[in-house]
Amino acid sequence: MWDELEELLIGADTGVSTTHKVLGEVQMRVEKERIKDGEQVKAILKEELVAILRTGGEKGRIWGEEEAPPSDRPAVILIVGVNGTGKTTSVAKLAQAYREDGEKVVVAAADTFRAAAIEQLKSWGEIVGADIVAHKQGADPGAVVFDAMSAAESRNADVVLIDTAGRLHKKFNLMEELGKIRRVIERKVPEGPDEVMLVLDATTGQNALVQAKAFAEVVPITALCLTKLDGTSKGGIVFAVSDQLGIPVRFIGTGEQPEDLTPFDAEEFVEALFQ
């Protein structure tokens, strides 16, 4: 049975280290509670997996009533991630979700490295009804963010979503760029962004953990958005990310449509692994 459970977890991209850690915890509980029934063992495993996903807690300032941003300014959400993860699409989906909640949204197209990202956001903006603030390709991302923050203030927006470039292979440039963006945000919001959300592609397996660690060295990640869960991927890598970095999952993306973004449910996610 233990081999079967190990195969299940590793097959779901949970990773060897996290798999062994979780199964070790389960074995200790099984021995302590003298459990013999296989279904009970699975139930304990599910409990341990859910607990891992909740270790990150509520790091951001906008997801609980007690830590909501002041009502006199927009909430600021910085979205980071490598190109190809569905980052820009996720920004549009978030804009759609906030619009459906009746919020006024301004999006900063600060991924000025890719012309496609700017045009993609402009197109999405028309579809979901969000205001897009964009400059030309190659423009200063900090200037885009400043203009977006100013526009949000003048238009009484509720939320500012900031799309950023994801060039991890040029780590110094990335650090410089994200550092500058944070400084621009802090000119308007001294405490910095309310949320820093990292978008990860569920199909990339262990590479997603490498990306998460790299971004966490550059900027304080407070949340994850897991994309491309509509394919064969089980997305088990989030257990390793949550376990090793203590970052909670906020959303999962399951398709290309604006509505294909749902709040993350730890119990449902764990149950899906066993189906």
Regions found by a protein language model. Give the residues of each.
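Primarily NTPase-proximal linker/entry elements flanking Walker-type ATP/GTP-binding cores
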Residues: 1-110, 117-162
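Short beta-strand segments
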Residues: 80-81, 163, 199, 253
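Short glycine-rich anion-binding loops that position phosphate/pyrophosphate groups of nucleotides
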Residues: 165-167
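Conserved catalytic-core segment of NTP-binding enzymes
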Residues: 118-123, 137-155, 169-275
